[in-house]
């Protein structure tokens, strides 16, 4: 974790995007000492593959690394307590006609197997002396051809000062897209903008006035005065539906196998690559008796947790994982005594096997030193052409035991 904190400090020396108050109040501004030692980190919005990623995503990632989940969610919408993925989408097109703004996003990267918890529309605006309402129409577009109307809201984005980034809660609009796909009814969202440094997000409320979607005109005058596609971002906080991953299939395996950035050639060159199978055991603990334990292998250390540094560059994943570049996953090694005791937190099955081993040594093999408690890891990486912040479960060994 010390490495993570050191590497990620650069983001706060060069932040240019605002964050909602629930994040801002919990992210300390650090000095530039780390950046000076690592000049390559100063250009924080570009990866070594020359692909951009938003500063906001880096800020969010670092906040999750430095703060626990309870502190992160306190005072904010309870929906943020439940997300496991954050996806950022830059606008594909920004158009205007009088007091109407038309914003188009490619929602193809959004998984229909995910449940939307929170959606933020973040718009960067210049500091100007102006105050008038604007109707914002939000569309889904794919390859510049398909235009699906998602909804509209009315706001006065110039009415407040502070951060140039104005944030609007558009969860209600996009929930229809997540639930109904193409069958979306027109909704009208009215919102009163508040400064990002105030409540963190504009309040919003729907009016019962559904109707036909506004006429989409690709020849509208581009918003050269106010907006650019790089200054309009949709941030989606989602969670995979329980039924999708009910088997417990490791989420990172699926992600890595589908990534176009994984260097499989490097992996194939590594010597001694073999496939291993491991047993799945019950996780019910049993209070041990007073039978004295003995060592199976004289002189071999007992079951314990040891370091295992995973460097993503070394395993060919460096081109798609933004952060962390490496982390300590830990591993378990050592011998398990016969019979097992409470110190090694065995399952019922493992304890019975150790007792059989004590009395009938040739009948069963020795219990194995394995992880019994795991913790997740937050990772920022490219998924397709988008940047995703995702929490992958069972990435770090917290405790070892015998099974």
UniProtKB/Swiss-Prot annotation:
One Gene Ontology cellular component annotation held by this UniProt entry: extracellular space
Annotated S-S bridges: 303-369, 332-400, 336-402
Subcellular location: Secreted
Pfam families reported in the protein's UniProt record: TGF_beta, TGFb_propeptide
Primary location group: secreted
Source superkingdom: Eukaryota
InterPro entries (UniProt xref): Cystine-knot_cytokine (IPR029034), TGF-b_C (IPR001839), TGF-b_propeptide (IPR001111), TGF-beta-rel (IPR015615), TGFb_CS (IPR017948)
Signal peptide stretch: 1-18
Residues the record marks as carrying a glycan: 68, 133, 169, 341
Example of a GO biological process term: heart development
Subunit: Homodimer; disulfide-linked. Interacts with, and is inhibited by cer1 and gdf10/bmp3b.
Function, as annotated: Cooperation and regulatory loops of multiple nodals are essential for mesendoderm patterning in early embryos. Essential for mesoderm formation and axial patterning during embryonic development. Activates the activin-like signaling pathway to induce dorsal and ventral mesoderm in animal cap ectoderm. In addition, also dorsalizes ventral marginal zone (VMZ) tissues during gastrulation. Acts in a downstream signaling cascade via cripto and cer1 to mediate cardiogenesis in embryonic mesoderm.
Name of the protein this chain belongs to: Nodal homolog
Taxonomic placement: Eukaryota, Metazoa, Chordata, Craniata, Vertebrata
């Amino acid at each position: 974790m010390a490495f993570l904190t050191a590497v990620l400090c650069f983001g706060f020396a060069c932040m240019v995007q605002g964050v909602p108050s629930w994040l801002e109040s919990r992210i300390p501004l650090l000095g530039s000492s780390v950046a000076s030692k690592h000049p390559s980190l100063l250009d924080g919005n570009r990866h070594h593959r020359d692909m951009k990623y938003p500063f906001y995503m880096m800020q969010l990632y670092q906040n999750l690394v430095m703060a626990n989940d309870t502190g992160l969610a306190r005072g904010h919408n309870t929906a943020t307590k439940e997300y496991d993925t954050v996806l950022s989408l830059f606008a594909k097109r920004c158009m205007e006609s009088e007091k109407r703004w038309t914003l188009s996003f490619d929602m193809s990267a959004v998984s229909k197997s995910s449940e939307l918890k929170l959606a933020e529309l973040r718009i960067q605006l210049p500091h100007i002396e102006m105050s008038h309402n604007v109707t914002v129409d939000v569309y889904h577009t794919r390859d510049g051809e398909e235009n699906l109307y998602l909804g509209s809201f009315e706001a006065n984005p110039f009415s407040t000062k502070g951060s140039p980034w104005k944030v609007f809660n558009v969860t209600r609009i996009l929930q229809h897209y997540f639930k109904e796909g193409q069958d979306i009814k027109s909704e009208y969202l009215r919102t009163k903008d508040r400064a990002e440094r105030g409540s963190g997000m504009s309040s919003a409320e729907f009016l019962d006035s559904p109707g036909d979607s506004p006429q989409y005109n690709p020849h509208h005058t581009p918003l050269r005065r106010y907006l650019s596609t790089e200054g309009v971002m949709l941030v989606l906080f989602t969670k995979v539906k329980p039924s999708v991953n009910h088997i417990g299939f490791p989420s990172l395996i699926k992600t890595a196998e589908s990534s176009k950035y994984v260097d499989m050639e490097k992996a194939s060159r590594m010597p001694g690559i073999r496939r291993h199978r491991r047993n799945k055991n019950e996780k019910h603990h049993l209070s041990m008796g007073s039978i004295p334990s003995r060592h199976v292998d004289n002189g071999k250390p007992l079951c314990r947790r040891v370091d295992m540094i995973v460097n993503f560059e070394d395993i060919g994943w460096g081109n798609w994982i933004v952060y962390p570049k490496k982390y300590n996953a830990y591993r378990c090694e050592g011998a398990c005594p016969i019979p097992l005791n409470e110190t090694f937190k065995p399952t019922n099955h493992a304890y019975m096997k150790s007792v059989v081993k004590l009395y009938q040594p040739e009948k069963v093999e020795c219990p194995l030193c394995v992880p019994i408690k795991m913790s997740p890891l937050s990772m920022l990486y490219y998924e397709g052409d988008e940047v995703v912040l995702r929490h992958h479960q069972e990435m770090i060994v917290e405790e070892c035991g015998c099974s």
